[in-house]
Amino acid sequence: MMAARLLGTSSRIFKLNKHLHTSKVAFMPVVQFKLSDIGEGIAEVQVKEWYVKEGDTISQFDKVCEVQSDKAAVTISCRYDGIVKKLYHEVDGMARVGQALIDVEIEGNVEEPEQPKKEAASSSPEAPKSSAPKAPESAHSEGKVLATPAVRRIAIENKIKLAEVRGTGKDGRVLKEDVLKFLGQVPADHTSGSTNIRTTHQAPQPSSKSYEPLKEDVAVPIRGYTRAMVKTMTEALKIPHFGYNDEINVDSLVKYRAELKEFAKERHIKLSYMPFFIKAASLALLEYPSLNSTTDEKMENVIHKASHNICLAMDTPGGLVVPNIKNCEQRSIFEIAQELNRLLEAGKKQQIKREDLIDGTFSLSNIGNIGGTYASPVVFPPQVAIGAIGKIEKLPRFDKHDNVIPVNIMKVSWCADHRVVDGATMARFSNRWKFYLEHPSAMLAQLK
């Protein structure tokens, strides 16, 4: 009898366990938040800083971590509400696109709806947005709407039917961002798991001691901008370089800038010499478009670029970075100065945006800010030409009467890809650039 009872009890327990194991878990699931595609062919990034730790409560749009790609510092924001259960990488570790950054335990049911609806493909263009939000076609007319309690609470507080909100999460899940978009509180170009260039971190302040002697050898990982420089310069070694040097009398430019400096100050514009160098280069490129070019990967074509996106080799706390000022041929000297100042400020804070680093067509490097006269700049592939500008020096020169007079002299060093640029073209371009700097008022004649 006792054995029979035990067998009966065991059978009931087995059936109960079987029933429990076949039930779907409908609460507190753990999801992986993965590193989304940053773009520009970037496959991996370095984790510079975590803004969360295991056990922290996190919400949608909260910052998760800051990563450093070869081109820019990027802040990764979350797309879930929940609790951080696991961090997958250490600080300074490398994370690959598509791999998990963190595990998040989220509230709500993640099981698929019993009768998922297949959305019909629409060929009609999206209607323009009006001031009052218009309900999109329901994506949840059949089955259960997937959303966390936090999202449902926002919907209830704003008297919104979640069935009218198109979910962009997995399996049509409605995210907080979707509800806020529906309310018109979030710009349309904001995306979950967005990668925003950081805006809060400042460049590290220098300590009172300018250096600290090393007591032993230190291995420094090649990361961030330096890693990008390694790749670029390795490619540049494949280019046969042609060099050309010259000097420019910038007496007139010094006076011209002094006249405009106060006028620029009234407009809150810091006016250095660099905007003049950039504008003069752009005007000269109009006459020699073969220098405002890029080559294709197979070296079968040289693409003459319509836009003058002039790159500036910039020294930053994170290493060398080469952003560019777009459409210099359409900008005035003051407009170029404003854009230059923006890039310089962003470089100091390591906040250079990705769009500022792409599509460059020609490069200038102002080594004169640090010192030096001549240099041997390296072409920035796939571009075909670069110039290095030395410091302005007061040097003795002969006037037309053979008298020795003091003259403001600036030296320039050009380098070009000798596979596609001949020496004569580089020399003629340099002469035209030199003419505009020695006669700065001539630049005004070119303005439209």
Curated annotation (Swiss-Prot):
Ranges of Polar residues composition bias in the record: 191-210
Single annotated GO MF: acetyltransferase activity
GO-annotated biological processes: fatty acid biosynthetic process; positive regulation of egg-laying behavior; positive regulation of embryonic development; positive regulation of fatty acid biosynthetic process; positive regulation of nematode larval development
Any one cellular-component term (Gene Ontology): cilium
Region (Disordered): 108-146, 191-211
Known EC number: 2.3.1.168
Name this protein carries in UniProt: Lipoamide acyltransferase component of branched-chain alpha-keto acid dehydrogenase complex, mitochondrial
Organism name: Caenorhabditis elegans
